[in-house]
Every structure is written in C-alpha cells, then in structure tokens.
Amino acid sequence: MNCSQFTPCEGRTEIVDADGRLIWHNDDICMVFVVRDNAPVVLAGLSGYGMRPACELNNEKGAFPIVEVLTSISGRTMNHQRLTDTREGSQLRFVAAYTYERGMRHVLRIDQKDEHSGLLTETEFSMFPGVSAVSCQSRIASERRLPVEAVSSLNLTVPLDAAGGGVDGVEVYWADSTWAAENNWHQAPLREIGLPDINTNINPRVPGARFNLSSRSTWSTGEKLPLGVLTMGEGIRRSALIWQIEHNGPWTWEIGEGIDGLHITAGGPNGDDHQWAVVLDERTDFVTVPASFAICSGGWQQVVEQMTLHRRALRSARLAVNGQNHDSEQLVIYNDYMNTLFGNPTADKELPLIEGAGKLGVDVFCIDAGWYDSADGGWWDMVGEWKPSTNRFGNLGLKGIASAIRKAGMGLGLWLEPEVVGVRSPIANELPDSAFFCRHGERVADDGRYHLDFRSPDARAHMDDTMERIIAEFQPKFFKFDYNTVPGVGTEIDAGYLGEGLLGHSRAYVRWLDDLKHRHPELVIENCGSGAMRADYAMLQRLDLQSTSDQCDPAIYAVIAAGASMSILPEQQGNWGYAQQEMDDETAVFTLAAGIAGRLYLSGFVNRMDERRLRLVRGAIEAHRQVLRNQSGQVPFWPLGLPVFSGDWLASGLLPYADNNETGYMTIWHRGGANSVVVEVPQGATLRPFFPKPGLIDKSHGAVDWHVEPLDGTHVRLTVSDNRRSARVYAIDMPDSTK
C-alpha cells in the first residue's frame, strides 16, 4: 500500500471565502480557519454554546496552526522546548477541505502539504449534534523519508479577544492523580504557574515558557489527569475551555504564549518525553491519538457540563458499534475486596457474603482477586492461566460458588488482569518472547510479572482462548479488568523506537477490548487500574464502570468521589461504599453517601450486619436506584466550588440538563472545621433529605443533626450539631424550569 498520498474523500468540498476564511459550525460550536498562500491553516476564531459566534467577530490576533509536526531534521523555528513553532508545521499549505457525516458525527477534514519535504497532513474535526464540543485527530504521511518525533492531536488558539480579556486574566484547572489520591484538583492564574509576562514589547521574540503536564508508560492517569480547564474573560463575555486526551498510554498537554495569543497543544507520546518516533515513507503513515475539547460561555462548571455530554456521545457511539446498550448503567454491584476479603476468598468466607448480598437485592456479586489461587496467597507472580483454584472452594469449587450466587438472585462477577503473566506462571514458558514486552533482548519484568504485548497474535490468542473458556464454563455477567503492572517506556519488539512499541500495544489492547465486546455485548466490564490509574476515555468509551480509587479510608474517599465527575461520567463512577457493622451510624452513612449520585460499588462484611444496619444499606441502594433512573440526562455540579483535597466541607451533585422539573441531587460531606456552610443551588430550588431517610439512623447510635436554612433564592445554609464526620444526600426539587 502506498501511504504517501492523501486518503480519498467523497465528502463535500468546502470553499474558502474571499477573506480567506473557512467557517465550520453547528448550533453550538463555530470554528473559523484562515487560509493563506504563504502560511499554514490557522484557527483564527472559536466559540461555543452561549457565546457570540466566532464568524461574527474579527480574527484572533496571533492565531496558531491547526497541527504541529516536529521532525528531527528540521526542528523548530526558534529555540524552546514546547511542542509548537515546528518548522514542518510552519511550512504546511492548504490543499483542500471536505465535510461529511460519520454516523452521528459531522466531520470537517482539512488537508495540507509541505512541498519542500513532501509532508501531507489530514486534520479531522468532528462533532455530535447538540454538544458544544469537538474531537480532533490528524493523519500524517510523506512522499519522502521523514523522521517525526512529535505530532499534535489538537492545537487550539485560545479565543482571548472574543472573551474580552488577556493572558493576565486566565485561570487554569488541573489535577494530580496517584494511588489512593485520585482527583486532586488545583486552580491558579496562568501567570503564576509558569507563564510570567516577559514584556514582548522589549524582548523581540515569542516567549518560550509553557505550563505542561504529561504521563509516562501505561498508567495514563497515574500521576496527572489527561485533561485541563481554562477560564477567560469577565462578565457576559466570560467563557471556559476544557480538553482531554483519549489515550491509554503516554500523553502531553501544554499551554503556551505567543506574541499576541495563547495556545493549547495536546497529543500522545513524543520523542522528548516518551522515546517515541515514527519514520514516514511510502509504506508508513501515522494517525495521532484522539483528543477532544469543549467550549462555552460561563465558567469551569458550565464547560464540564459540555464535556460530560461529549463523553456520553463518545460512549454511546462506541456502544452502538459494539452492539451494546446502556443497561449496564442500572446495575448495583457488590465486590468482596475492599475492606473485606482483600483478595483472599474461600468458600467459608464467600457463602455468608453471598447470602448477605442477596438479601440486599444487589444485581452482581463479584469475586475479586484470588479465585484462581492454589498457592495459598502466593499468586502474584503466578497469574496468567486464569483457572479456578483447586483448594480455596472445597467440594463446591468455583462452579459451586457461582451457582450459589445465581441462586441468591445475582449475576457472577470475576476479577482478571488480562495484560499480565507472572514470571512463575506456566504460561510464561508456553508463550514466546515476542508475546511480551522486551528490552535489551530480555523480557521486561516488573514486580514478578511479565507484560503481554497485544500486537502479538500469540498474546491475543492466549487471552481470547482464556476469555472464551471462562465465559463458557462459568457464565459470568461481569468482569473486573484490573491493571497493576507498569512496563516502563515500551518494547523493542517489532518497533524502531521503544515508545512506538508501547503505542502499538496500547492501540492493539483497545482493539482487543472492542473485539471482546462485539463477541459478547452482554458482558459488563469494569475498568480498574490499582484504582483509577488508567481512567482515560480510550478505555472508558469502551468499558462500563470505573473504580475511582483503592482508598480504604472513607474520610479521604469523600474528596476523591467529590471530584470524580470532572473526568469520569457519573454513570461510570464506581465509588466504593464499604459500610461495616462496627461503624457508628454516621461513619456508615459517610461511606455509603459516596456512591449514591455516581455508581454505588458495595463492599463490606454484609454477613455480619444486624437488621438495623442492613436497613441502612438497603436504604442506600434504594436511593441509588432512584438516582439511576434519570442519571444519564443529568450533569455534575459543585455547590461549594472545586473540591479541595484537604477541605473540611465537600459537595458535589447532579442537575437535570434539559429544561424540566426533574429532581437533582447533592452529596455533602463534613470532615471537621466550621459547623455550618453555605451552598449554592439553582434559582428557586429547595433541598429535601434523600439519604439517609428518617428512621434509618438515630442519636443513640451516633447520629448528627443536620439543619437546612434557605437564605435566598440561590443559597442555603447547612448546619451540623457537632464536629464529628458526617454526610448527607439531598434531593434538589426544581422549580418549573432549571435553566
């Protein structure tokens, strides 16, 4: 196949107007591109929901090219370390533009070429109807050999002129993410986090500074989140922009300043950070990892609403391709791991838990880690066969345990790590080296485990056979796919560069997931990675549930749950609720409250609970099922603003997006400090106790009094009777219109 040419396109050819403008829009988004004979195509205008259309405004000063391509033989046009100002990007020239439909998406493709190097680029923008968001991706090819070390997935000109403000007024929101401390959000003026004003009136060159985040290896959310938010302008022209990178591997995003403008650049792996490169020639082209952005009037909460709608559209489109529906979003799941068995299941332990979970009326009982262990706890470096333990479940065996789960009215769930093989596993000897990540001529091992390379036919065949065997033998309804091994920078097998091998595996793995889902659309699969260490939308548009953390302390879990909707759909947030009999009432409510407005992921020794405590857990499940009825039509909000990881008061909730009088919900946690707080609610809305319902807790068992005091049409004061940790979920009853 000759890759050194443009991909044929049957779409409608778009015409550039007399002013050199190419305008693309729907009812919400408007993008204005400027085409010149002596310059690359630039994004000179951008607007979204609630903003004045960009096509009615002057072009943004200092607009940036729509794609950047960094090569080792031409570099940048100036000396800095950003992903922008690439020489190849600056030499691209407009060839053609096309619009067409792909499923529900409206697509614009802009083709450019550098006649000197032979580089071709096809930059694609796509949007769903009714959503103020756009997906971006580029294909690059070359007529001659060209070594490429970075390509942008998106390169946005921030519409500062349209917002009526400058760089000095820009605020940035970003998040740290590490094991047991996910969703640690921060906010700061851009000028204070790496982009100082260097006075370009005196210094005659583009500033070289940037604010950037990146990830390494395969934990795409293991250090930082692959998204950010930017707010700009004031008053009626105030607007916000959010972006995300949809890749289950390394990524980078940055904010940088030009002479007259600001850019956001985002993409997958690159040479400087990830040892990635690709050499283009007539047989080799390259497609970037996808990225998306949303833009609208208002602040960060309004633009998160739009990204929530976009994530739903991405997920719905993928479900349709794989022949699935949204039924999985109604399931209540019990898992035996968290603060309970911790990966040490036996028949004697499981049967009482199964009976207890059955009495609660949950839909799925998941046996977490250990069901395959015949080594009395020494399974970590022996996994890979995924065959049931011969000594943990007595005469019943795993089949008998599965039968007990079904007799109790629940579906079976099983834990699995598809991508790893223990160094002591028989599978390690059966598969060739080419089935694993290798460096320096040896298999890569991490903590006693090898990492499968899903580009390998042997690796895929092993896991295909494994999944089909388990499904045929045990008829599970649910899988928890975990991921606890990080293989480093990549693999040298069938790759010119280590990062190239890693990218190839990452893409092959999601294709394997698509194939599995297509063969078994009835399967519900959780995405877990030591909690939420790989919670990106390459994975989450395909899988159904995301464990938001492995955090065992409900006091810390509260802030993780409170911030989860910034990056994960509410209907995919598996927030653990691990109530125990020995907890006082308020501690039990505190942990259960985390899952009510997301996805209540139950654990705990339910077999040890008395009837009074079981009523409380049933009350949580009943409240959660009420939320699930309308959850997919609601968007997140934060009545106390951005959750602070060390904050005393935390709050998050759901509001109906459409103009209707559906009920919204607010979860609020008090972890200490002042005994009262004022929350903001929609105009005319009232708060009603939702969980726990009256009678489920009382003062004799440690209950705290909560008092609700309306102050005006949009503010309510909440007061607690003492400083002990406590939480409540309130229903938000709307007036006739919510927006």
Locate predicted features.
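Short, structured beta-strand/loop micro-motifs enriched in basic residues and often containing a Trp
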Residues: 262-272
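Short Pro-Gly-centered flexible turn/kink motifs
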Residues: 28, 278-297, 725-732
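Polysaccharide-binding surfaces and accessory modules of carbohydrate-active proteins
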Residues: 2-37, 41-256, 274, 688-708
